[in-house]
């Protein structure tokens, strides 16, 4: 079995977290397990389910520049404690640098930076985020994005690496007698002849 260590904000019912849980529920957990680095102190809605499914939740020191050395040590210790952890998958946009650098120092050979948003929020952390964005490609072995625009906005450019990918958001094509009221009619846009579809 290999374990994939995901770095997230916390495991509440956000878009990224819900997507990860949809995958987690359906993978063969005898072969692959998910663990989670959470970067907020607040417990997440999915925490109990993760533990029931066999996953671990690791509380980080937080994404604060003052905690950066402690954060690197935390990731190294987390990886060293379980040699089955083979992959670090960061979902924190530019701030994923913290987990990726820790994983690099721990010797993990697969370190994925995954961009999900099309912008970097301009808040008081914006200068730090822009700094991390420039360093992030050097810490990651793979740059993934939900779409090309997300890659160009959130991830600094680097010359083509074989592991860099763009993954469109998956849609469910399962027929439903009663689609939710907010579901868009998108058969024409996707080329499907009939039916409702919505992001799962």
For the regions a language model picked out, list residue spans one by one.
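Membrane-interface segments of envelope glycosyltransferases acting on lipid-linked substrates or membrane lipids
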Residues: 1-200
């Amino acid at each position: 079995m290999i374990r994939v260590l995901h770095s997230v904000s916390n495991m509440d019912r956000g878009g990224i977290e819900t997507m990860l849980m949809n995958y987690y529920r359906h993978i063969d957990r005898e072969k692959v397990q998910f663990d989670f680095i959470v970067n907020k102190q607040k417990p997440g809605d999915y925490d109990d389910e993760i533990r029931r499914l066999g996953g671990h939740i690791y509380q980080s020191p937080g994404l604060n520049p003052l905690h950066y050395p402690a954060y690197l040590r935390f990731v190294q210790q987390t990886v060293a404690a379980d040699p089955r952890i083979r992959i670090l998958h960061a979902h924190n946009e530019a701030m994923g640098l913290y987990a990726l650098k820790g994983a690099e120092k721990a010797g993990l050979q697969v370190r994925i930076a995954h961009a999900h948003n099309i912008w970097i929020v301009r808040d008081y952390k914006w200068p730090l985020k822009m700094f991390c964005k420039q360093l992030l490609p050097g810490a990651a072995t793979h740059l993934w994005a939900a779409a090309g625009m997300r890659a160009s906005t959130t991830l600094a450019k680097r010359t083509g690496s074989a592991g860099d990918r763009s993954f469109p958001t998956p849609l469910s094509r399962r027929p439903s007698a009663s689609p939710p009221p907010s579901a868009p009619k998108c058969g024409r846009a996707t080329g499907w002849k009939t039916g409702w579809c919505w992001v799962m």
